[in-house]
């Protein structure tokens, strides 16, 4: 019975994401960066050279490689992608509080735990599908422009980036549960990500910050060994957001 109800809630989330165009927007974002990143890596040296041409300025720009395309994709997603994910996720629960959908559903025999779990899981699945689209697009265009390409290496980098974005989503959904409206939830999520970035520069404690995952993806590009601490820190953040999110929502009075 609970399994069937959970699947119904998941289906409701997917339907809502489609109707609200959140699914299309996130897919479009990853598709866009999947195309633009290899293009930027390939043609940026030529653009810079043409800009300084005739100005008696000499700039030595190394020839772009497929690693530059991957690095550009990671940079784009970890900056603009994070901002867009926060915007799309900040209303996950807060929006339904505002329009009364949450109150309507909870009048029925719907478990609050399953309600929140369906929110987290559906968002994670949406992110995974979007990442897959971005991954395949980068692979295609990098193959076209650079020829050689390490699929396994990029898969590892994409997995690290996915974990980082799951952290972003988890924090945003947590504040969406905590807050009454969307805007404060988004602001708090953004401030928390900034705080995690500041924590990452601290000594022994900072190495556990999820913000270090972006650095780990760059380390993998250069074929160096990665550190496990940011992964442990990310797992703790995700579990805490889900656990405390469920706990707070149990006490929410519709």
Which residues does each PLM region occupy?
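Transmembrane helix-loop junction
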Residues: 16, 95, 108, 139-143, ...
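Central hydrophobic cores of alpha-helical transmembrane segments
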Residues: 26-31, 184-196
